[in-house]
């Protein structure tokens, strides 16, 4: 189980990404549309004024059951450990053990 502080930090990042997504997208679009060098610098400064954690790149996928950041399967939103346990218990519909 991940530390609660790390899980909460990720939740905070998710909230910030959602809050500033429209503003960040508008600034990026304005940056690409700008032709004047000075204007681009000003837009870039405005982008830098946004909180660091509002950037989608700073988010980390975490298992929603345990909070584990590594071994994450996007299709399920689970870490490899939980995926294996739940698949063996039959808690994941459609997941069957491979045999050939």
UniProtKB/Swiss-Prot annotation:
The keyword Coiled coil does not apply. InterPro entries: Ribosomal_uS14, Ribosomal_uS14_bac/plastid, Ribosomal_uS14_CS. The keyword rRNA-binding applies. Keywords: Ribonucleoprotein, Ribosomal protein, RNA-binding, rRNA-binding. Pfam families: Ribosomal_S14. One of its GO terms (cellular component) is cytoplasm. One of its GO terms (biological process) is translation. Gene3D superfamilies: 1.10.287.1480. One of its GO terms (molecular function) is structural constituent of ribosome. It comes from the Bacteria. Belongs to the universal ribosomal protein uS14 family. Part of the 30S ribosomal subunit. Contacts proteins S3 and S10. Binds 16S rRNA, required for the assembly of 30S particles and may also be responsible for determining the conformation of the 16S rRNA at the A site. This is Small ribosomal subunit protein uS14. It comes from Rippkaea orientalis (strain PCC 8801 / RF-1) (Cyanothece sp. (strain PCC 8801)).
